[in-house]
Amino acid sequence: ACGIEIALETNLCPSDFEYLLENCPPDIGVNYDSGNSASLGYDVKQEWDTYGAKIINVHIKDRLLHGPSVPMGEGDADFDTLAKMLSKFDYGGNLILQVARGESGKEVEWYHKNRNFLLDRGIG
């Protein structure tokens, strides 16, 4: 009633996360993280088809499979499918850049590089 939304972000596979959500109050949402998904080897389409209607927040980053965050476009995140899912589910929530840091002192340059990377894929 006070305008606060609660979202869960986990490393559970889609079916286990779906089970968790089914056992939570219906107003609990999902914070989706593209990098964590890539790191765990999950299928973006399967995740969104499983609980996309409950996604209220999206963290955007790139990660290697079973590895760390890397600059956008250098990891295993499936941004093309993510763009399709954002459109399919008419997502209108936050897109939060949680990207790997570039060279110190060049934050503005890195911001524009990351933003353009996403815009080129229809995200944002």
Task: Describe the residue ranges of each PLM region.
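Catalytic beta/alpha-barrel core
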Residues: 5-12
